[in-house]
Amino acid sequence: WTYDAQGNKVSYVNNFSDVSESGFGGYICEGRQLGETYMYKVYRGSGEGYTGGAVDIHAGPKDGMIRTKEDMVWVQAMIDSGYSFGGMKTLAKDQLWYGDILYADSNGDMNYGDTNDRDFSGHTSVPKFNLGFNCAFSYKNIDFSMLWSGAFGHYLNWNTDYYNSTLVSHGYGIIEHIANNHYFYDPSNPDDPRTNQSGKYPRLTYGTTYNNRIQSDWNEYKADYFKLKNIQIGYTLPQRISSKFFVSKLRAFVSMDNILTITSYPGLDPEIGTAIGYPLMRQISFGGQITF
């Protein structure tokens, strides 16, 4: 029997000095990682709420979502003290309401989540290194090979309408994980069986002014993956048999592509990114090889 194994690791190195080369299609900023994302950050408070007197700007919802009456009281106290959220100072279903996400006031201008609050995330959409490994074995007339590949050290912001967004629209469906686990609370009917104040995703919205769909770290996911890209198994007929067909080698094989993906990324496929496209298909093919 025989075997062969090869691997490769390609790391990318950040350039924190002058930019002297072109060719990258994303953002390039001196002193920042290549492809570092620039986005809103979700507000995260202590959850203590408003207890009277001067409002504590750090006492809001722990995960940034308005979930309870106490959260709403704190938001109203903030508005009464001159703060705004995405430019809004009104609590209403078609504006800022239960199940909405609050964004951080990164620049301290008392407007939480306006366009000036975007900041570098410290994460990049460009993998820090790519890994590949292939090996092949053969025993007598049987051969076997496989190819693995992976990418590590990057993040993807998956916030695509109708795939990972709580926006609803006529004629479009809602993806299952959001349909089954979105926030719902009607203060006029707290006993509504649909109530789900611990929902993982924001409330479903249609035509509201407040925006839960902006690019933020709420929808940022670690996109590391390791894939079994190909397996091939073959069998070569003994030469004493193949010679009867006037060929020196006759080999049959089965090849399987995109067999396994190991990842925590919840989107379609971390290899194709956040774009909406058909994911890489799992394929099985059969073939033959003839050498005269």
Where are these regions (language model features)?
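Transmembrane beta-strands of outer-membrane beta-barrel pores
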Residues: W1, Y139-N141, G150-H154, N230, ...
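Conserved small-residue
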Residues: W1-S121, Y183-N189
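Flexible, surface-exposed loop regions and adjacent strand-edge segments
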Residues: W1-Y3, G7-S17, D161-G171, G267-A275
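Extracytoplasmic gating/loop element in the C-terminal half of outer-membrane beta-barrel translocons
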Residues: S81-F85, Q95-Y98, A151-F246, L250-R251, ...
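Residues that define the transmembrane beta-barrel architecture of outer-membrane proteins
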Residues: P127-L131, D224-K229, L280-I284
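Repeated loop/turn-to-beta-strand initiation elements of outer-membrane beta-barrel proteins
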Residues: N141-F144, R240-I241, I284
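Membrane-embedded beta-strand positions of outer-membrane beta-barrel proteins
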Residues: M146, A252-V254, G288
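Outer-membrane beta-barrel "beta-signal"
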Residues: Y235, L280-F292
